[in-house]
């Protein structure tokens, strides 16, 4: 196993962890209002009213966000399989070829999720329009983690494909 394979494996693992964390954290969209802060996630929606304890419930997701969640979960599975194949490439060199294609599939799935997610900004909890959030609403830390997972997947693919050779 060469250094570039190890680097790409670490990048894919980081992307995998960031994607899992982005789903687990209910901060994809944050209203940040002082009276009642609302954070909307893909698996939980939390609200804090006037400094009381935070209350979290499962959200009713629009079809666009269900599709986004599906694509992210499939991307996570792809990256997990990729990491396994890169470990297996220590013994069977041809596993690297399959790992690259599966990682590429994961990148496509993540990019599709990133394109579809903003279509769901129209829901009542957010109050925006497709691809346009209201002025008082921002994307949260979970969305940033998800974008980082896309970035690490792309850079990992560059190293796995030996496109980004050092020196």
UniProtKB/Swiss-Prot annotation:
GO CC terms: ciliary membrane; Golgi apparatus
Any Gene Ontology biological process: negative regulation of smoothened signaling pathway
InterPro entries assigned: Mosmo
Pfam short name (any one): Atthog
Protein name: Uncharacterized protein C16orf52 homolog A
């Amino acid at each position: 196993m060469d250094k570039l394979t190890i680097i790409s494996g670490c990048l894919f693992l980081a992307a995998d962890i960031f994607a899992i964390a982005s789903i687990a954290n209910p901060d994809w969209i944050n209203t940040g209002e002082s009276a009642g802060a609302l954070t909307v996630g893909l698996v939980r929606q939390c609200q804090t009213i006037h400094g009381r304890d935070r209350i979290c419930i499962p959200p009713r997701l629009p079809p666009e966000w269900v599709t986004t969640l599906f694509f992210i979960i499939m991307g996570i599975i792809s990256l997990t399989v990729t990491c396994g194949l890169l470990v297996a490439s220590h013994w069977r060199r041809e596993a690297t070829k399959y790992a690259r294609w599966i990682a590429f599939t994961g990148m496509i799935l993540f990019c599709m999720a990133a394109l579809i997610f903003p279509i769901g900004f129209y829901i009542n909890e957010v109050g925006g329009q497709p691809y346009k959030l209201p002025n008082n609403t921002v994307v949260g830390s979970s969305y940033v983690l998800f974008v980082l997972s896309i970035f690490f997947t792309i850079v990992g693919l560059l190293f796995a494909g030996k496109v980004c050779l050092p020196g």
